[in-house]
Amino acid sequence: MTSLPGGIYDGDLGDQPMSGLVPMVVEQTTRGERAYDIFSRLLKERIVFIGTPINDQIANLTVAQLLYLASESSEKPINLYINSPGGVIYSGLGVYDTMQYIGAPVSTICVGLAASMGSVLLAAGEDDSRACLPNSRVMIHQPMGGAEGQASDIEIQAEEIMWLKERLYEILALHTGQDIDQIEADADRNYWMSAEEAEEYGLVDNVLNPDNLEGLKSIQPNGEAADDSEDDA
């Protein structure tokens, strides 16, 4: 049996604790009341939230939301909030590639934790639109995984995880401006950073304290969707 390369989360990636705990939001419109789950309501404001470990299910939902918002407007920013310990690298790379592919700029904001693949997605946001809240924690490290079976199968899996490691380091170097050798040295073990240290490292551009929110409107809810809600069918 081979485990997919991933991050620090050691639970079942198929068991998402948020399921069944999604609150509903009720809005008053000229046509009566309308109820949304909270994530659909945030989507109307062009906000996408990754708040769990990243697996195929979460990645597919995130990709679908990004594609939908990009089809609605290729110019208005999308705000991607991240509170994730990471997860399956292949799933995360699907989200990463979508962020780079769509025309709409994607702002990224770390709320709580962006570790492993979560830190890669955080760094992959639009230039000057990547941020952490003050008490966020960010962590980079090399891929984790394991393999069982014949020696040839283990060798194949080892080659694959080495390729993934090199590719992730290239992505981090691209978005942080750090030298690949420096990233490789830092990521050899879990490399934890505060919000300020993540900014200094180049993973984000700002730490969102109350005194520096002015001018960062690209990562603020735009409120336009709320104005349009009464005109919806």
Swiss-Prot record:
InterPro entries: ClpP, ClpP/crotonase-like_dom_sf, ClpP/TepA, ClpP_His_AS, ClpP_Ser_AS. SUPFAM superfamilies: ClpP/crotonase. Its EC number is 3.4.21.92. It comes from the Bacteria. GO terms for molecular function: ATP-dependent peptidase activity; ATPase binding; serine-type endopeptidase activity. It is found in: Cytoplasm. Keywords: Cytoplasm, Hydrolase, Protease, Serine protease. Signal peptide: none annotated. PROSITE patterns: CLP_PROTEASE_HIS, CLP_PROTEASE_SER. GO terms for biological process: protein quality control for misfolded or incompletely synthesized proteins. It catalyses: Hydrolysis of proteins to small peptides in the presence of ATP and magnesium. alpha-casein is the usual test substrate. In the absence of ATP, only oligopeptides shorter than five residues are hydrolyzed (such as succinyl-Leu-Tyr-|-NHMec, and Leu-Tyr-Leu-|-Tyr-Trp, in which cleavage of the -Tyr-|-Leu- and -Tyr-|-Trp bonds also occurs). The active site is at 116 (nucleophile), 141. Pfam families: CLP_protease. Cleaves peptides in various proteins in a process that requires ATP hydrolysis. Has a chymotrypsin-like activity. Plays a major role in the degradation of misfolded proteins. Fourteen ClpP subunits assemble into 2 heptameric rings which stack back to back to give a disk-like structure with a central cavity, resembling the structure of eukaryotic proteasomes. Belongs to the peptidase S14 family. This is ATP-dependent Clp protease proteolytic subunit 2. The gene is clpP2.
